Amino acid sequence: MPKYRSATTTHGRNMAGARALWRATGVKDEDFGKPIIAVVNSFTQFVPGHVHLKDMGQLVAGEIEKAGGIAKEFNTIAVDDGIAMGHGGMLYSLPSRELIADSVEYMVNAHCADAMVCISNCDKITPGMLMAALRLNIPVIFVSGGPMEAGKTKLSDQILKLDLVDAMIQGADPTVSDEQSEQIERSACPTCGSCSGMFTANSMNCLTEALGLSQPGNGSMLATHADREQLFINAGKRIVDLTKRYYLNDDDTALPRNIANKKAFENAMALDIAMGGSTNTVLHLLAAAKEGDIDFDMDDIDRMSRLIPHLCKVAPSTPKYHMEDVHRAGGVYSILGELDRAGLLHNDTHNILGQTFAESLAEYDIAVTESQAVKDFFRAGPAGIRTTKAFSQSCRWDTLDDDRTNGCIRSKEHAFSQDGGLAVLSGNIAIKGCIVKTAGVDENSLVFSGPAVVFESQDTAVEGILGGKVKSGDVVVIRYEGPKGGPGMQEMLYPTTYLKSIGLGKECALITDGRFSGGTSGLSIGHVSPEAAAGGTIGLVNDGDIINIDIPNRSIELHVDDTELAQRRATADQQGWKPVNRQREVSYALRAYALLATSADQGAIRDKSKLEG
């Protein structure tokens, strides 16, 4: 039977100094011998998705202590991708994921914590904590801050639902008046919480449900709704039970690597494809799997993308539905239920509730549950009141959206498309693959061919797009923006936003070794691997080269003969695979990240071979 890790610091005369310090934090005589549970918070006033988390740590801590544990809270950093976007700050976003994972490892191992509750929400925080959880492999429960309410405003006598991307597009569109742009800006982000569409933050928080590491509703219950408080309370109670199951009952099914195993990762990917999640989730799932020594890679994602239908279409892929609508339709468990009925889910995997998914779906899938409490839980809706306070309203929808023919969530028979919401493409320009969010691609653009217009950075791409260098039918290529080449693998939301603002959103393709915001839609292909800085073919593309994209056949090809490519490669080898005439200040912290970074097909994790003797 494993003993508490914390016993290293709480037992034995030689640990008198450590106990003295524990006492100084409030630990009493009768507490020694209880499990020490880290409450890993991420409160910051910089990020709307985290601005309301200040009191959440102590809410969870109180429940842990009532249930017989010792709770100790600490914070990680949290970067807001929307605020960091469009300038040098975006270089720091993806690297912050590794920093978060490392900081959790440092704190938990330095103080010998026995388990942890991870309070996350936004883009890199949930993935960073997930990587740490699988690296440490101690009992863990995730509970997120919850999504923001969708914005609403009245234009031309119509009530429009809005999100951050609407504000960005309107702000970039020269045909939109200053007054209308400001109206959209003031209405787009009305409350605390992660941005209201199926962007990266909400996608990842939904995926923790499918991985079995969070409770039903974690990804969809609004940050402002009073019902969300119960998720935090239950997390505090359940983590103590989970901890005792492992340490006192020798039950290793309570450990995250046994919950989030290969089958669970396949469930999470199935959910991601079915709900048209952010392409960033692919990057983060690959990275988390590597941390847990789980055999899950791009081949698995490619295989699944050919099997899973697109069952849930949410902003930015449609203006009709936001996360509040997903929740009204039953949230993640309703999507999982539809996948299960289609034979596309491993329902024998377990979760932190101590149930198999078959058991949990019987209780939490609104299509089959007999529980009125569960149905009421999923009727929790928006209040439409601007606020930064959690649990500040108790509004409910009059009815659930249980329409699986024309609703927000659909059955396989009535899917938005039988082809899923994400796809892996490969070819000579992306030998190790690349990712496209097919949920956001116009059906007329699924097969596309055009001449390349090449840019060596996001900044020059924006200048070129706004300066008229891109025309209808072009394939915009933005390279040297990968994990190593950026460094930091910036999001390309501004180039795609500006293409939309000048009427080319459906007229052009964009490919990059960088990545995209969860708010991106259109024919936007990212994560091209290997990246240019690692010798990838994307670094050999010249202006005017024809690129063919065929999403149904999962191919992307540069039409340049092998002899010419070999000559270009020899030249690039001599030049060291560096961008031409790019001026960019890169700090030593980012240079250190770049030295170890792998391409996107590996999740942009560190190259461990460079750290091993």
Swiss-Prot record:
UniProt record similarity statement: Belongs to the IlvD/Edd family.
Name assigned to this protein: Dihydroxy-acid dehydratase
GO BP term (any one): isoleucine biosynthetic process
Active site positions, chain numbering: 517 (proton acceptor)
Pfam families: ILV_EDD_C (PF24877), ILVD_EDD_N (PF00920)
Pathway: Amino-acid biosynthesis; L-isoleucine biosynthesis; L-isoleucine from 2-oxobutanoate: step 3/4; Amino-acid biosynthesis; L-valine biosynthesis; L-valine from pyruvate: step 3/4
Subunit description: Homodimer.
Chain positions recorded as Mg(2+) binding sites: 81, 123-124, 491
NCBIfam families attached to this UniProt entry: ilvD (TIGR00110), PRK12448.1 (NF009103)
One term of GO molecular function: 2 iron, 2 sulfur cluster binding
Residues carrying N6-carboxylysine: 124
Cofactor note: Binds 1 [2Fe-2S] cluster per subunit. This cluster acts as a Lewis acid cofactor.
InterPro entries: Dihydro-acid_dehy_C, DihydroxyA_deHydtase, DiOHA_6PGluconate_deHydtase_CS, ILV_EDD_C, ILV_EDD_N, IlvD/EDD_N
Positions annotated to bind [2Fe-2S] cluster: 122, 195
Keyword Membrane on entry: no
Catalyzed chemical reaction(s): (2R)-2,3-dihydroxy-3-methylbutanoate = 3-methyl-2-oxobutanoate + H2O; (2R,3R)-2,3-dihydroxy-3-methylpentanoate = (S)-3-methyl-2-oxopentanoate + H2O
Signal peptide bounds: none
GO cellular-component term (any): cytosol
Co-factor requirement: [2Fe-2S] cluster; Mg(2+)
Keywords, ordered alphabetically: 2Fe-2S, Amino-acid biosynthesis, Branched-chain amino acid biosynthesis, Iron, Iron-sulfur, Lyase, Magnesium, Metal-binding
Annotated function: Functions in the biosynthesis of branched-chain amino acids. Catalyzes the dehydration of (2R,3R)-2,3-dihydroxy-3-methylpentanoate (2,3-dihydroxy-3-methylvalerate) into 2-oxo-3-methylpentanoate (2-oxo-3-methylvalerate) and of (2R)-2,3-dihydroxy-3-methylbutanoate (2,3-dihydroxyisovalerate) into 2-oxo-3-methylbutanoate (2-oxoisovalerate), the penultimate precursor to L-isoleucine and L-valine, respectively.
EC number in record: 4.2.1.9
Keyword Repeat attributed: no
